[in-house]
From Swiss-Prot:
Localization annotation: Periplasm
Record InterPro entries: Azurin, BlueCu_1, BlueCu_1_BS, Cu-binding_ET, Cupredoxin
Primary localization: periplasm
PROSITE patterns: COPPER_BLUE (PS00196)
PANTHER family: AURACYANIN-B, OUTER MEMBRANE PROTEIN H.8
Plastocyanin-like domain mapped to chain residues: 1-129
Keywords, sorted A to Z: Copper, Disulfide bond, Electron transport, Metal-binding, Periplasm, Transport
Sample GO molecular function, one term: electron transfer activity
Name of this chain's protein: Azurin
Pfam families referenced in this protein's UniProt entry, alphabetically: Copper-bind
Length: 129
C-alpha cells in the first residue's frame, strides 16, 4: 500500500487533490505538502489540516483566532487529527499520523485553515481496505 501522498496548494487557493485515500494496512500515513506558488505565507500561506467532517467548521473558526504564529490551528485542539505548519511559496512541510486514529465509516475532511481559504481548499480523506 502507498502510505503517503503529495499534495500542493497554489497561489490560486487550490489544492491539486480533492480526495485522499488511506489504506487500513498502513500503520502510519504521511502527507507531503508543497506550495508551488510565489506568494509569502502571511499573504497566501497554506497548511493541511485533518479533522472529522463535522469538526471542520469549528476547527477553522478557532484556528483563525489562533493566528499565523500558531499555524492557524488552536493549540492542543482535540478535533485536529494532524496538521502541517503554514507554508508560503516555494516551501514544503510534511506530517505523519497514526492510521489507528481513523475509524472506518467516519467522514474525514482535510482543508487549509488560513483565513478565508477553507471554502475552496478542502477535500475528503477516506480509510479504505
Amino acid at each position: 500500500a502507498e502510505c503517503s501522498v503529495d499534495i500542493a496548494g497554489n497561489d490560486q487557493m487550490q489544492f491539486d487533490k480533492k480526495e485522499i485515500t488511506v489504506s487500513k494496512s498502513c500503520k502510519q500515513f504521511t502527507v507531503n505538502l508543497k506550495h508551488p506558488g510565489k506568494l509569502a505565507k502571511n499573504v497566501m500561506g497554506h497548511n493541511w489540516v485533518l479533522t472529522k467532517q463535522a469538526d471542520m467548521q469549528g476547527a477553522v473558526n478557532d484556528g483563525m483566532a489562533a493566528g499565523l504564529d500558531n499555524n492557524y490551528v488552536k493549540k492542543d485542539d482535540a478535533r485536529v487529527i494532524a496538521h502541517t505548519k503554514v507554508i508560503g511559496g516555494g516551501e514544503t512541510d510534511s506530517v505523519t499520523f497514526d492510521v489507528s486514529k481513523l475509524a472506518a465509516g467516519e467522514d474525514y475532511a482535510y482543508f487549509c485553515s488560513f483565513p478565508g481559504h477553507f471554502a475552496l481548499m478542502k477535500g475528503v480523506l477516506k480509510l479504505v481496505d
